Amino acid sequence: MENIIDELVKIHNENFKNKVGDKYFSEMMLGEQYEIYCLFNFMGENIFVKKLKDKSGKEDKNFGKKQKEKTNFGKNEENEKNVLGYIVFYGTIESTDIFEVAIEKKYQGRGFGEILMTKSMGKLSEDRKNLKENDLSEKEKTDSSENKFLLEVNEKNVKALKLYKKIGFEKISIRKNYYGKDENAVIMIKCY
């Protein structure tokens, strides 16, 4: 797991202004409110999405089976399992916030962000639905059948905005100066 955390730190630090160390992801792994999914490349041919832990903090063995997807890897790229990107969800009672999502820079623009987001959101929605079915009354099940995913993105991040719209997110508001002076956040939602 340490190797994976090192890769997450590397990907985070090449994508975000605020630099972090191992402790950043280690603490998330311990927190019950966070869910982390990674997009892996295996042998330059197959990619798969894997949830790093279940609610007990143990690695989730049930969601890591290879899922074949068409990839855009060249034959000369690394032929070993490595992390291409990750997504961090933060669960609340009413919704799930996409806390952070990043793809390693050299793999951006190839559709991996879309695969990571759609696969992980689908799996998380399925897990939440199963939990609701086990824990709620019949009335509560019908009242809360929708999963809401929320995210915020810098309005200047055109590539990310395009991806989020493509996978069904809708703009619901703007937070002025959220990232600093003249750096506004677009708040987006997707119901699953």
Please place each PLM-identified region on the residue numbering.
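Short gly/ser/thr-rich secondary-structure transition/capping motifs
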Residues: K19, E170-K171
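C-terminal "cap" of GNAT-fold acetyltransferases
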Residues: N147-L150, N154-L161, I167, S173-Y192
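Conserved GNAT acetyl-CoA-binding A-motif
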Residues: L124-D135, D143-E152
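Conserved glycine-rich acetyl-CoA-binding loop
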Residues: E104-T118, N154-K162, K166-I167
